[in-house]
């Protein structure tokens, strides 16, 4: 239930109700953030997106207690004259819009660059010109490769955190060669970050930049052939979920050796709410939002997901639960990757007092329970062969 009474920020100051223009509100992160804002705060949401499937439960029926606090506007920010007017109506703009699926980075590099840089330019411009605060969602991909990845594999410094832990104010952004179009996303995201930062420095734009480190949970991406294109390749959680639902081996790109950290969407949304409601502490900062305690290789993630799914579904694992594939075979020509992505949490902990809470096992159990409940029957119907007459 929304509770506007006696809400105070981290410094004990009363929190005033805001009108928030959320661009990309219909996506994975946007849907969870809308839920949080509507059920636990008095804030109003102008929800902008091309699709609203993931927030329909918040828009219908009109009798829900927050019906007067959310408006959905079907907008493609590429070419819609309504965007500036909606920005002017708001106190805060949150830009979540992006192409953020690795399979697209080197197969659709132009769309990736336009979506993440060119299409975001008007949002930054309107915020700066109209003195509106902006929370811009970037990505941990802006860090690119770690310094340690350039050392020999047996070099002792590869285990030194100084060579792989990623810090917002210190770590360099290291990308692959131009032919490796996988970095089109990271470059576009880094450039829009630099523009936002420059608008703050030169024109006084109030901004916060968020760098998510693998946020996962219910409603992430899609299951190919069920609520997304059959040929689509979603991110790793949905890819592995799709394999588990179809009782297929989980595909490990280049052996699944890359190391990643994963944070539960509910924990991450708590961090975003702190940014929204503590502008004096968040303005001008870039925040890593991840969980360094949940570090695994992609192979270990696959093994854990197989174990968790067997528990929540009651189905035993298949005989060969994983299969190795090359990155060229899976993603196409021009793919490249980083070896590790481990966030340093010093700044967000100091400014906002935020720390993630949910273990990898618990977040996978919650997420895969949702995946099984939501998709198992549909996948079964889609994969069952018609009975011969």
Curated annotation (Swiss-Prot):
Q: How does it assemble?
A: Homodimer and heterodimer with AXS2.
Question: Which body tissues produce this protein?
Answer: Widely expressed with stronger expression in leaves and stems, and lower levels in flowers, siliques, pistils, pollen and roots.
The gene coding this protein:
AXS1
> What is the regulatory mechanism acting on its activity?
Inhibited by UDP-D-galacturonate.
Q: Which GO terms describe its cellular component?
A: cytoplasm; cytosol; peroxisome
- Effect of inactivating the gene: No visible morphological differences. Plants lacking both AXS1 and AXS2 are not viable. Heterozygous axs1/+ axs2 and axs1 axs2/+ mutants have intermediate phenotypes, including impaired seed production, sterile pollen and lost of shoot and root apical dominance; these phenotypes are associated with strongly reduced UDP-alpha-D-apiose (UDP-Api) levels. Cell walls are thicker and contain reduced number of rhamnogalacturonan II-borate (RG-II-borate) complex in heterozygous double mutants.
Q: Please tell me where NAD(+) binds in this chain.
A: 28-29, 49, 76-77, 96, 185, 189, 215, 235
Query: How changing residue 139 to V affects the protein?
Result: Strongly reduced activity and accumulation of the UDP-4-keto-xylose intermediate
Cited Pfam families:
Epimerase
Q: Does the keyword Repeat apply?
A: no
What is the designated name of this protein? Answer: UDP-D-apiose/UDP-D-xylose synthase 1
Q: What is the lineage of its organism?
A: Eukaryota, Viridiplantae, Streptophyta, Embryophyta, Tracheophyta
Q: Which reaction does it catalyse?
A: UDP-alpha-D-glucuronate + H(+) = UDP-alpha-D-xylose + CO2; UDP-alpha-D-glucuronate + H(+) = UDP-alpha-D-apiose + CO2
């Amino acid at each position: 239930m929304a509770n506007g009474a006696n809400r105070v920020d981290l410094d004990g100051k009363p929190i005033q109700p805001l009108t928030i223009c959320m661009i990309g509100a219909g996506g994975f992160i946007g849907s969870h953030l809308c839920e949080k804002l509507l059920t636990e705060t008095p804030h109003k949401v102008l929800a902008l997106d091309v699709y609203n499937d993931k927030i329909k439960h918040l828009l219908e029926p009109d009798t829900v207690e927050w019906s007067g606090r959310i408006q959905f506007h079907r907008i493609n920010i590429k070419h819609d004259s309504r965007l500036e007017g909606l920005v002017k109506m708001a106190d805060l703009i949150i830009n979540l819009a992006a192409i953020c699926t690795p399979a697209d980075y080197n197969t659709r590099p132009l769309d990736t660059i336009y979506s993440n840089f060119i299409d975001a330019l008007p949002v930054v411009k309107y915020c700066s010109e109209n003195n509106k605060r902006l929370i811009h969602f970037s990505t941990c991909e802006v860090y690119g490769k770690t310094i340690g990845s350039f050392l020999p594999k047996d070099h002792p410094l590869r285990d030194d955190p100084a060579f792989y832990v990623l810090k917002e104010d210190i770590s360099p952004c290291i990308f692959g060669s131009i032919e490796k179009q996988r970095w089109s996303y990271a470059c576009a995201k880094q450039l829009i970050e630099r523009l936002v930062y420059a608008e703050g420095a030169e024109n006084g734009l109030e901004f916060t930049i968020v760098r998510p480190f693998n946020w996962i949970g219910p409603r992430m991406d899609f299951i190919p052939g069920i609520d997304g294109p059959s040929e689509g390749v979603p991110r790793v959680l949905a890819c592995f979920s799709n394999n588990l639902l179809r009782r297929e081996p989980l595909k490990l790109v280049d052996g699944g050796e890359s190391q990643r950290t994963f944070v539960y969407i509910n924990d991450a949304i708590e961090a975003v709410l702190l940014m929204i409601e503590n502008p004096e502490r968040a303005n001008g900062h870039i925040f890593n939002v991840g969980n360094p305690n949940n570090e695994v290789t992609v192979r270990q993630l696959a093994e854990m997901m197989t174990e968790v799914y067997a528990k929540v579904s009651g189905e035993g694992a298949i005989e060969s639960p994983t299969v190795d594939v090359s990155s060229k075979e899976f993603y196409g020509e021009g793919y490249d990757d980083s070896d590790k992505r481990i966030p340093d949490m010093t700044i967000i902990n100091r400014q906002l007092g935020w720390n993630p809470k949910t273990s990898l096992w618990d977040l996978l159990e919650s997420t895969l329970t949702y995946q099984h409940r939501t998709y198992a029957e549909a996948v079964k119907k889609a994969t069952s062969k018609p009975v011969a007459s």
